[in-house]
Amino acid sequence: MTDSTVFSHKPTLPGDLVVLRPVTEDDVPALLPLYEDAEIMRLTGCHTHFEEPALRKWYASRGAQDDRLDLAVVERATGRVVGEAVLNEWDEENESCSFRIVFVPDAVGRGLGTEATRLIVGHGFEALGLHRISLEVYAFNPRARRAYEKAGFTAEGVLRGALLWEGERVDATVMSVLAPEWAAQGAAG
């Protein structure tokens, strides 16, 4: 991948349960629970408290970023924004990036994350030409790790004591999926 504008196009990715579309400032009210829920903050290892004006500014700027892709996850059945899926930390020379996904509490456990992950990761490999997509998941989030494994991610190693949370050191597992593995999954599934 040599086109430095590869992330400039912000697509809409339709699925059966969800639609991923470019996130906007107007999505902030629906996404506020991501920044207010103590359990979400713990599971994502986020120590920072965000105020709504700062979030509005952040989300308003996402469409102009040419080094990342921030998409809102919209539940088809309700039309409600229930989370976000992001490809970021793009390494152009090595055709790789990081992935993160997060949902408001009442959207968890209904298959929305599985489909959203398949949509954005598939886009990364099939449309953007990435070779590797990686993530980190904390040891106290086994549910997310199982979801990532289900989506085809493989554990590569452990970052020992990567997070200090409430006085305790927490390991993070590095996981990734490679383009050939993704293609083989598609052929098998």
Where on the chain are the PLM-derived regions?
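A cross-family signal for key residues in well-ordered alpha-helices
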Residues: 32, 118, 122, 176
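Conserved catalytic-core motifs of GNAT/GCN5-like acyltransferases
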Residues: 23, 134-137, 154-174
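Conserved phosphate-binding and hydrolysis motifs of nucleotide-dependent enzymes
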Residues: 83, 141, 152
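Conserved GNAT acetyl-CoA-binding A-motif
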Residues: 126-136
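GNAT-family acyltransferases
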Residues: 1-107, 169-170, 177-189
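A structural signal for the main folded, soluble domain(s) of proteins
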Residues: 125-126, 179
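Conserved acetyl-CoA-binding loop-helix of GNAT-fold acetyltransferases
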Residues: 109-124, 142-150
